[in-house]
Amino acid sequence: MLEIKNLNKKYGSGKVALKSVNLTLPSGQIVGLFGENGAGKTTMMKSILGFLKYDGDITIDGEKITHKNIARISFATSEHSFFPALTPEGHKAFYKEHFDTFREKRFSALMEFFELPMRRRVGSFSTGQKNQFEVLLALSQGA
């Protein structure tokens, strides 16, 4: 379970990005984070992932997030995290080698579900296909 309690973030300029955010997400939950520009979506994600200092508490199953348990969180963004020069086949090989939690069967099933080509460079995919592939990678990373 991911718990956020009284999350606050103020930037050096004095701008308040997050104020008293509280959120509880059960394990296995898939959620979308939507809001207007400047609403704090990216700031919240960067706080959860440990990229920003913040005030408040963010825990996974009652433990502070560390490099050891962060792999239990997967996310997809509109700023694609895949390697454009690799094919999906190349991504599968990379993730299998580098991430113990990578779920190869789920990856293959989602590739089939989205009807994406395995041997074409991801950078040549349409925008919609790139978005599908981004979600597919997030769902295949063992969270």
Predicted segments, located by residue:
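ABC ATPase nucleotide-binding domain "signature" region
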Residues: 32, 130-138
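Conserved ABC transporter NBD signature motif
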Residues: 50, 54-69
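Short coil-to-beta microelement around the adenine-binding A-loop and adjacent beta1/P-loop entry
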Residues: 14-16, 67
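Short, conserved post-Walker A segment of ABC-type ATPase nucleotide-binding domains
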Residues: 31, 42-51
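Conserved structural motif at the start of ABC-family nucleotide-binding domains
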Residues: 2, 16-18
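ABC-family P-loop ATPase nucleotide-binding domains
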Residues: 77-133
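The feature captures the beta-strand-to-loop junction immediately N-terminal to the Walker
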Residues: 34-36
